Amino acid sequence: MVQLNGSYKLEKSDNFDAFLKELGVNFVTRNLAKSASPTVEVIVDGDSYTIKTSSTLKNSEIKFKLGEEFEEDRADGKKVQTSVTKEGDNKLVQVQKGDKPVTIVREFSEEGLTVTATVNGVTSVRFYKRQ
């Protein structure tokens, strides 16, 4: 069984700018986001999950229980209702509702974390190495 708890450092991004553009993030913020190299920390405590993302651009944190809806500030600055479910032992699927629904799939492995985010058919894949 793959351990979800841990710290992960961004190594590579594919199509991240196009994803942010489709989401409605402005040019300046997109360029800052592309140059940032975030660290993601995942903490699982019983049935409670915390995902902290830290970078020179911005820090964010979401806390949730699987299947329970919560409010979150999306990358475009909008507040949206979000829920997260678990598929198998190593995959978290996050759905952000709103004018532009977003699906974020976090797949964990011994080596790291792959984050696949999709909005309006535009998909970005980001690869993080386990620290």
Swiss-Prot record:
It is found in: Cytoplasm. It holds the Pfam family Lipocalin. It comes from the Eukaryota. (5Z,8Z,11Z,14Z)-eicosatetraenoate binds at R106, R126, F127, Y128. GO terms for cellular component: cytoplasm. Keywords: Allergen, Cytoplasm, Lipid transport, Lipid-binding, Transport. GO terms for molecular function: fatty acid binding; long-chain fatty acid transmembrane transporter activity. Gene3D superfamilies: 2.40.128.20. Belongs to the calycin superfamily. Fatty-acid binding protein (FABP) family. FABPs are thought to play a role in the intracellular transport of long-chain fatty acids and their acyl-CoA esters. PANTHER family: FATTY ACID BINDING PROTEIN (PTHR11955). This is Fatty acid-binding protein. It comes from Tyrophagus putrescentiae (Mold mite).
